[in-house]
Structures are given as C-alpha cells and as structure tokens.
Amino acid sequence: MTEIGYWASQEQYSMQQLIDFVKEAERAGFESTLTSDHFHPWSHTNGHGNFTWVWISAIAERTKKMKFITGVTAAVYRYNPGLIAQAFASLDVLYPGRIGLGVGSGEAMNEVTLGFDWPSAEIRVERTVESIQIIKKLWNKSENNYYDLEKTRWNSSKKDSNSNINCSVDDDGFVTFIGKYFKIQNAKLYTPPSTNIPLFMAGSGTNAIKAAAEYTDGLITTSKPEGVKETFELFDSAAKIANKDINSLEKIAKPKVSYSEDYDKAFKATEFWRTTQIDDAFDININDPRVLEEKAKREVSDDEQKKSTIIVTSIEDLISPIEKYLDAGFTKIYIHSTSPDEIEFIRLFSKKVLPYFRDKWKKA
C-alpha cells in the first residue's frame, strides 16, 4: 500500500526530542516511522548516539498504533544476527504488528569504531545475506518462494562462494547454521515473534539490490526519482527470477527536506547532513565523526548541499517533489525532515500535504 511516513534521526536529535516528534507525528496522521540505527552520528557538532532498539520500545509504549522500522540495522559485525532476531522478536511480542526490521551492510563509523574490520562492499553484502538467512530461520518467517542462501543467484560472478553453507532446522525448531561468516548451533528463540515481521534491505550497489529482491520484503534506497529507473529494473528482474510477485514488494525512499519561511534558516538546518554528500560516504573507511565533518566542509560545496535536500519556504511546495517519487515507482516515502522547527513542520505537513495525497489515493 502506498504510504507517506515519518523519519526519525537518531543521530541528530535526543531521545526525548524524537519521542516528542513522533508523538506529534501520530497525532498528525502519520502511521509509520522509519528510524536510523547508528553507534556514531554522521556529524560531530550537535550529534547524538541514541540506542535505537531501546528508543523503539520507549516510543512504541507512548504511541497507540504507530509502526516502527529500522532504517537500517547493520547486520554485518557489531550486531550478531541471532541477537537481532531475538531483539526484534521480543519487540514484536510487546507491540505486535508494529515492528519492522531494515538491514544493511553498515558504515565504518559504526563498525570500525567498535574494533571490527572494514572490508569491501561485496563482503559486507555477503555477510548481510548470511545474517538475513539466520534471522529468518530463527523467526520461522513465512514467505512464498524463499530461496535458501546456498541456492542464491544474487551474485552470479560468485556462484560457488556460498557452497559451504550448511543450514538445518530440527523437529523442535532448533536452528544450526554454518556459514562463511556466521555460525549458530542448535539455536531457538524461546520468545518467538507474534507476527510475520516485515524485513527490508538497504542497497545501492548491484549485489545489494539483487539480495534485497530475493531475500526480503522490499528495498530501501537513497536514490532520487530521476536516477532510480535502473535500480528498480534490476530489483524487479531479481524478484522475478526468485518467483516473487513484484507488486508485493516495497520500494522505500527517505527524501531529505527542510522547511522554513526563511530560506536561509531552512538551508542552515541541513548542515548536519553535509557529511552524507562526501564521495562514497557510505563506503568510506572513516569512523570518526570529527574527521567526516571536516572533510565535508572542505569537499562539499553549498550548491551540492542544496541539491541533496528539498528546501522549501512554502510547505505546499513539497507536493510536487513527493509526486515525482511516487511516479518513479516508490511505494513508501519516509519524510526525513531536518527543518529548523520540527514540530511546526509536522503540523503544517499534516494539514497541507498529507490530506492532498490521501484524497488523491481515495479517488484512484
């Protein structure tokens, strides 16, 4: 189902601020929240380092129906896939039908910081796919036409790379998985999820996009409408090969926006995210936010920064850019606002923008 949701930035705001924002978002009519999952923030100045899993439990308790998805949890090093499966199963028991998991191949700021290596993107995607396999086995996740990892076709150039995978589930539901990177032995979630938890994967490279199509319920991408056609063609093709119904899979965007009647204030409020415009920002082996921030100041121009964010002085001016995302094929759009006054943004967006799209969808 097409939806416009809210984005909660764990790196930019305190836990209490985000609780206030999301409570306001629910009152305003938003039904789901996508939220980041970092150890370090993208920028040192005014950065925060909230533990997302704790925050999700706190905010779910303080809201009534709002759904929460991580965007994304790195299933590569610092989080063991068994612990991810256990944590989100427990959240789903407490808040059934309101919890989703987004996974990805991580950033150096969160993995290298805690003593782990930073290998190639190819290896990180391989690790992520193994993690997905373990999580789904432990959840006993139901899905039609699900491919086991050893049968994967997501990386045709490495057809034999996963040939040593060994996975089994006994009659009592105990999982044993011997992989290239991860191993669990006779593991069972004694507190299993109460629902079929949605599972998504972030990706921009070929291998990650194919893996998202074959192994998860949808793709999270930072691609913009004008550059996403090839991404979606690759995603749809991989889904068809896996005998999946492409119409059942989500294509998720999270456009950055900033609103203020004063353009200069709206632009200034985007500064925290300048680091994300560094070349290869998501792959670069820099784990210190201070270094990232200084590098961004040197290398990312104001013009580049302005192009990275939809900056508006009238809230209605967000309608056209959002329509472009929908026309490009995105099914869910999470609005990543970095506005100077976030509460004002939420209230105005809910009065002027959300009703426009809901009326449009009703008539369709």
Residue ranges and their predicted role:
Residues 1-364:
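Active-site-adjacent structural elements that line small-molecule/cofactor binding pockets in enzymes
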